[in-house]
């Protein structure tokens, strides 16, 4: 027994004035309606539907795609502006974060992680004031190097932040570290009570 799959002739071919929606078109219309409630795709849906019943005239066949193209171009321009704005902000942030080597280009995620670390470092510099004369305020703030994992020789390994390590490599003291970090930003170090 052989079956032939016949494709029915669409109602829109036989009766162009009658608008029947298939199940897929109905589902698409429902999802488009939910998109419209968020202000999304309004022009695309309007172009696809054509003029409303109260418009009194029909749009020419070429007007719909032109509207869609203009809207797409406008959306692309907005996205380019947004991307350029984000990239400009990252460039500005990169100039504020000290890196080694100085000319190192950071990725966006590296920039965010290093900025977060640098903010924590500066907070430790501000909180400890002159109490951390060894140039490692983050080491001092972290509990003096107590770690759950002992070093191979039985001593506790020292945890140190990137910026304290950089200062240590340069041979600077706490005063150099705090002064340089804060002077670059135009902020004077806080003088807290000595312990």
From Swiss-Prot:
Modification type Phosphoserine: residues: 60
UniProt keyword annotation of Cell membrane present: no
Domain bHLH residues, every copy: 70-122
Family matches, as InterPro entries: bHLH_dom, E-box_TF_Regulators, HLH_DNA-bd_sf
Main subcellular location: nucleus
Keyword match Membrane: no
Transmembrane region(s): none
Cellular compartments per GO CC: nucleus; RNA polymerase II transcription regulator complex
Compositionally biased residues, Low complexity: 56-65
One family name in Pfam for this protein: HLH
PROSITE patterns: BHLH
Region called Disordered, residue ranges: 44-65
Job of this protein: Early transcription factor that plays a key role in somitogenesis, paraxial mesoderm development and regulation of stem cell pluripotency. Essential for the mesenchymal to epithelial transition associated with somite formation. Required for somite morphogenesis, thereby regulating patterning of the axial skeleton and skeletal muscles. Required for proper localization of somite epithelium markers during the mesenchymal to epithelial transition. Also plays a key role in regulation of stem cell pluripotency.
Protein's name in the database: Transcription factor 15
Organism: Mus musculus
Gene name for this UniProt entry: Tcf15
């Amino acid at each position: 027994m052989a079956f032939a799959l016949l494709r029915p002739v669409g109602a829109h071919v036989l009766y162009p004035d009658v608008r029947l929606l298939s199940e897929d078109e109905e589902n698409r219309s429902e999802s488009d309606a939910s998109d419209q409630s968020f202000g999304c795709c309004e022009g695309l849906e309007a172009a696809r539907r054509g003029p409303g019943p109260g418009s009194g005239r029909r749009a020419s066949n070429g007007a719909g795609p032109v509207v869609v193209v203009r809207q797409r171009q406008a959306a692309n321009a907005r996205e380019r502006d947004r991307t350029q704005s984000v990239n400009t902000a990252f460039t500005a942030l990169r100039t504020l974060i000290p890196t080694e080597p100085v000319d190192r280009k950071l990725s966006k995620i590296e920039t965010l992680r290093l900025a977060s670390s640098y903010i924590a470092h500066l907070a430790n510099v501000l909180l400890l004031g002159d109490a951390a004369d060894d140039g490692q305020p983050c080491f001092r703030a972290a509990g003096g190097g107590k770690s759950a994992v002992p070093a191979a020789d039985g001593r506790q390994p020292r945890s140190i932040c990137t910026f304290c390590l950089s200062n240590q490599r340069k041979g600077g003291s706490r005063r150099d570290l705090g002064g340089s970090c804060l002077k670059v930003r135009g902020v004077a170090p806080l003088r807290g009570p000595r312990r």
